Amino acid sequence: MGNLTYDFSGQTAIITGAARGIGLEIGRFFAEAGADTVLIDFDENELDIASDQVGAKGIAADVSNTESVDKAIADVMATTGRVDILVNNAGILRDKVLWKISDEDWDAVLGVHAGGTFRLTRACVPHFRQQEFGRVINVTSYTGLHGNTGQANYATAKAGIIGFTKTAAKELARFGVTVNAISPNAETRMVSSIPPDKLAEIAAGIPMGRFAHPSEMAAAIGFLASREAGYITGAVLPVDGGLSM
């Protein structure tokens, strides 16, 4: 995928959940646009492959663990000396109807999605404030706005990320930091775990008749990370082919 629009040379971009799918494509986007790109993921084997593919630095970390996150950001600072762009994309699924969701499944999903978004952002804020510049883009979901059967934990986590995005945007604006979110329905491994009949039903309800490609998510994130988007903050951008209309 070529990038003819943005130049992120001299900036460091961190992407979580970056070993595959949307995260990998986002990493590729920033690397091709000249950023010092850091991929963070829990899966070390896939992370090594992804890092080699896009020419980025890979850091294995558990976004649901504060010590692991803080160590990862310290590693980034030791390597590049700055943090400019943070894309919170890490996520997992533990889909069940709510009366079958265990405490463990509930805590795991919220810990990665909402907890990871919080921990990474918190760890980067001191560096954003010192630089008087920063871009945070959180990946939420159509489900966070509208709910979905069998995804009470996921919907709650994604809705929480929307609230976090708007609150962080208000708190960080005076430091030159923007905080936004995208709401995608991308074609990734997480989507492919949905039963085919349910997937076809969802696709039929999308005005554009298909799921997004991860590169389309990356392009939207690239815009929100750019200096051209410097006056946009607290926004939740649907990138879903009109599904949320």
What are these regions (language model features)?
Residues 44-45, 61-71, 103, 215:
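The beta1-alpha1 cofactor-binding region of Rossmann-like NAD(H)/NADP(H)-dependent oxidoreductases
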Residues 118, 133, 210-239, 244:
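C-terminal substrate-recognition "lid" of short-chain dehydrogenase/reductases
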Residues 6-37:
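Canonical Rossmann dinucleotide-binding motif of NAD(H)/NADP(H)-dependent dehydrogenases/reductases
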Residues 97-98, 105-107, 202:
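Substrate-binding pocket helix/loop in short-chain dehydrogenase/reductase
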Residues 173, 178, 232-234:
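Short, small/polar-rich loop/turn modules that mediate ligand/substrate recognition or access, typified
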Residues 121, 157, 165:
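Active-site helix of classical SDR
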Residues 141:
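Residue(s) in the substrate-gating loop at a strand-loop-helix junction
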